[in-house]
């Protein structure tokens, strides 16, 4: 996983692969981590999409990076606030 990627493939605990579109990535100085927000590409335009979030270590060697779960309630609060700001900015642009 690197900043700027448009699509990522998520593999669930059963080994199923799902292609997802990256909504955006960002860094948090507070938690000293990078985060990615993404959603399944197969979601229909008229459906409400479920946005997922993970932390990751930016990869400099061109290898596949590893997504990691969000660990604390404080991280979730920060991610939710960042997402709400992003969505509000998107609405203003339309």
UniProtKB/Swiss-Prot annotation:
InterPro entries: UPF0473 (IPR009711). It holds the Pfam family DUF1292. Signal peptide: none annotated. It comes from the Bacteria. HAMAP family: UPF0473 (MF_01448). Belongs to the UPF0473 family. This is UPF0473 protein BLi02866/BL02030.
């Amino acid at each position: 996983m690197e900043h700027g990627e448009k699509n990522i493939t998520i593999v669930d605990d059963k080994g199923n692969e799902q292609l997802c579109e990256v909504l955006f990535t960002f860094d948090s100085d507070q938690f000293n981590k990078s985060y990615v927000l993404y959603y399944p590409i197969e979601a229909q335009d008229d459906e409400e999409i479920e946005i997922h979030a993970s932390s990751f270590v930016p990869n400099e060697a061109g290898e596949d990076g590893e997504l990691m779960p969000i660990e604390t309630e404080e991280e979730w609060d920060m991610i939710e606030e960042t997402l709400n700001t992003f969505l509000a900015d998107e609405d203003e642009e339309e």
